[in-house]
Curated annotation (Swiss-Prot):
Origin organism lineage: Bacteria, Pseudomonadati, Pseudomonadota, Gammaproteobacteria, Chromatiales
Reactions catalysed: [GlcNAc-(1->4)-Mur2Ac(oyl-L-Ala-gamma-D-Glu-L-Lys-D-Ala-D-Ala)](n)-di-trans,octa-cis-undecaprenyl diphosphate + beta-D-GlcNAc-(1->4)-Mur2Ac(oyl-L-Ala-gamma-D-Glu-L-Lys-D-Ala-D-Ala)-di-trans,octa-cis-undecaprenyl diphosphate = [GlcNAc-(1->4)-Mur2Ac(oyl-L-Ala-gamma-D-Glu-L-Lys-D-Ala-D-Ala)](n+1)-di-trans,octa-cis-undecaprenyl diphosphate + di-trans,octa-cis-undecaprenyl diphosphate + H(+)
Family recorded in the similarity comment: Belongs to the SEDS family. FtsW subfamily.
Localization per record: Cell inner membrane
UniProt-listed Enzyme Commission number(s): 2.4.99.28
This protein's name: Probable peptidoglycan glycosyltransferase FtsW
Amino acid sequence: MSRFFSTRQAVGGSTPQPDLYLLGAAVALMGLGWVMVGSASVAIADSRFGQPTYYLWRQGLFLLLGLVTAFGVWRIRLAFWEKLGPVMLLLGLGLLLLTLIPGIGVEVNGSRRWLALGPIRLQPSELAKLFMVIYLSGYLVRRSAEVRTIRGFLFPVGVFAMAGLLLLLEPDFGAVVVLFATLLGMLFLGGARLWHFLLLAALGGASLAALAWYSPYRMQRLTSFLDPWADPLNSGYQLTQALIAFGRGEWLGVGLGNSIQKLFYLPEAHTDFLYAVLAEELGLMGSLAVIALFVVFIYRVLLIGRAAERAGRTFGAHLAYGLGIWIGLQAFINLGVNMGVLPTKGLTLPLMSAGGSSSIVTCVAVALILRVDLETRFPKVARRSVK
């Protein structure tokens, strides 16, 4: 049991092995997510394509591509990503800008968040999250002393402001919230002064609240969250249907594949509200199992970050912390939205929800975390065997 609370058990070995707790939790979440995507999408896939298993195999292909890409990323030294950080940031901003250009960006449900690349769609906001974390990790290493000055503190804030503005123009308010919270966490762990941190948190929180207050549809989401049953057939529809799914699941669920809510009652059943369908089919026990897997995953990520910090691998530490904050926060928000304790944000559940960009990028994020662990515990092996 003590091995679960440590990352040092395999340091003396000659063969590099990944953190099995982290890898096991990630694989379990992906596997369970794949099964639930197939179950939750049966009705909509049959209606749209005449093939009930369409999204099951589509998501399986994305996961396969994600795993292949992740393996390639895992084989590359962290120093490469550290040097490439500024270029990746510019690429991310450029992709976000392209989504706003008519004829290039693809509009769905009033939001222009995708780029059409032949038969597939790329969601730049997912790449922007990853690229921002990589860039900030390198910045905190290069400017470790300057971060404690107002100038060094404000520079990454300005970078975030550019990305945040482009995301708001899509609009993608949920991605802005996740990026802002990740920025706050990384700056705080990177040694920023407490008063700088508190001031940014207050100003950022006030700005996000103002955006919600002066945006009619965001305000409608907030009011419907506070009392979804006041308008269960309009503004509160998604949340009430999700709550019905949770109620039907009871302790052990209605059985895999037996959800009623996925039959066109619950919108986005295979993406944003996958967890509600899971709760209906697998019950409270299944819901708690998912939460437990995420807790194990994030805990191990933070342990890896702490081990890298103690080993003097600062970039790896910041990278692990940043990726952990991002994935953990997005999972927390999605689960909270599904359970009705947070307003609707339109964020997918990492490692589980359907979506090509989200699945592949999250697999890459896991690979980077495992790379941090590898270079921390097996520095000689990493230098010798990985180029």
